[in-house]
Amino acid sequence: MMSDQENENEHAKAFLGLAKCEEEVDAIEREVELYRLNKMKPVYEKRDAYIDEIAEFWKIVLSQHVSFANYIRASDFKYIDTIDKIKVEWLALESEMYDTRDFSITFHFHGIEGDFKEQQVTKVFQIKKGKDDQEDGILTSEPVPIEWPQSYDSINPDLIKDKRSPEGKKKYRQGMKTIFGWFRWTGLKPGKEFPHGDSLASLFSEEIYPFCVKYYAEAQRDLEDEEGESGLSADGDSEDDDGSLGEVDLPLSDEEPSSKKRKV
């Protein structure tokens, strides 16, 4: 019969063995994910070149993506529509120091004359341990500079002189909830920055970018169906269609994100 000390030693060996097995699992999972990312990289590059030849590709994808609309205020779509290039790159392909979940997103905005400057912006996202040392870590980022539209001057955090007054606080909150506020998101200031900024970043890296062709095809089918229905209704009743979303100016109260597909 084993003594208590011997039992403790056996348990310690078992736990040590389990820990080593978990390390092996993590290493294999990383190896598999790196293999997948390496195989997909040239395909994405070739696909992106074809996308560049299709007018308003990203406008159509983003306008018709319901989940994306849940994060975006209706008034922002005027500027979202100027995005003509999106590229996601996984940092682990560049260096072993990165987690396979670390990535960057690059946007090119063609701009709006007299209001919004043409520009390209890259935002990097990395997994880091949180204060409570979560096992999987949390997604974080660093603020990156982006030129805001002139029409947003009143809610641009950099231009609000008195952020402590009730009016200043209100405008600051409005600005931080715009898509431009998302470029300031860090993941380290809950309640004080763009809401659910990590989820929006993951939406780009896990859904919108990898499956953009599928979403584009679905959007095209939806638009064709709408055009067909419009043709039929034109011959019949002429009821008002209140299902579409137009541009909405920011009201004094916080504007809610859109949650429906838009007509392009």
Curated annotation (Swiss-Prot):
GO terms for biological process: double-strand break repair via nonhomologous end joining; nucleosome assembly; protein modification process; protein transport. It comes from Saccharomyces cerevisiae (strain ATCC 204508 / S288c). The gene is VPS75. The C-terminal part interacts with the N-terminal part of histone H3 and promotes acetylation of histone H3 'Lys-9'. Residues 223-264 are annotated as: Disordered. It is found in: Nucleus. This is Vacuolar protein sorting-associated protein 75. Histone chaperone which acts as a cofactor stimulating histone H3 acetylation by RTT109. Preferentially stimulates histone H3 'Lys-9' acetylation by RTT109. May also stimulate histone H3 'Lys-56' acetylation by RTT109. Assembles nucleosomes (in vitro). Its main location: nucleus.
